[in-house]
């Protein structure tokens, strides 16, 4: 009996013809597009500024006057940053998933992953500190519609509280992910 060669075996692409490709133009026109570059650089800058503005200050904001408005504004800024970073990473991930064999695409994906991880490290403190605010204080702050709007998200974040580790350990896990 003759052995079959892997050269003669049909592949999924040869069996089904040309496979469909994602149109990622709704995210970015291309990996070198000015829109992608601007979003990434802007998010990196805004992430560092967010950390400067809020790290170590959430407990005081929650206890201060206008706590709901102040925390609501912070969550709104966090949300905008998270959306931008997610959009960039979604684009990079989908490009890579569409062609894992292309070294240029793999490099682009790796570069984006590295930059997004570095930028999001500036945001990691936010959920950790939010979970340090006691329930009664946070509940009172959520009476303000500015923060109350984010109640479902805050409740999800609070579910992670029992599993939260020391900040430095969380940072280490984040860097390694």
Question: What is the meaning of each model-derived region?
Answer:
Residues 1-177:
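A well-structured
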